[in-house]
């Protein structure tokens, strides 16, 4: 999986698509999220997973953030970096299996 990621990271079209994705996240997506905030919530269960070796839980409360957007939020820290499924496939699988059971 890592080699596939690297191959895509070398493709100019893929790099452009990644940049457009992040550009939308801080512009159009952000504006739409702000307009939607407080008007409704996601009503199905939401699972939040994050890597223990990353910065997400150091900077944010991953579950707490999603409670503004969803009624039923569950979360689990996985012993991995940013790429949970690639770095820690079994714990990621177990967390998802438990959630979808």
Regions found by a protein language model. Name each.
Residues 72-101:
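Catalytic active-site module of serine/aspartate enzymes centered on a nucleophile-bearing elbow/loop
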Residues 1-69, 74-76:
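Conserved serine/cysteine hydrolase catalytic core
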């Amino acid at each position: 999986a890592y080699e596939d990621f690297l191959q895509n990271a070398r493709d100019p079209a893929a790099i452009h698509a990644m940049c457009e994705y992040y550009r939308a996240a801080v512009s159009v997506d952000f504006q739409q999220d702000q307009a939607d905030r407080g008007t409704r919530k996601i009503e199905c269960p939401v699972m939040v997973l994050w890597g223990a070796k990353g910065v997400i839980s150091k900077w944010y409360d991953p579950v707490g953030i999603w409670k503004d957007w969803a009624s039923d939020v569950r979360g689990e820290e996985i012993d991995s970096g940013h790429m949970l499924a690639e770095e820690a496939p079994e714990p990621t699988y177990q967390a998802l299996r438990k959630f979808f059971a």
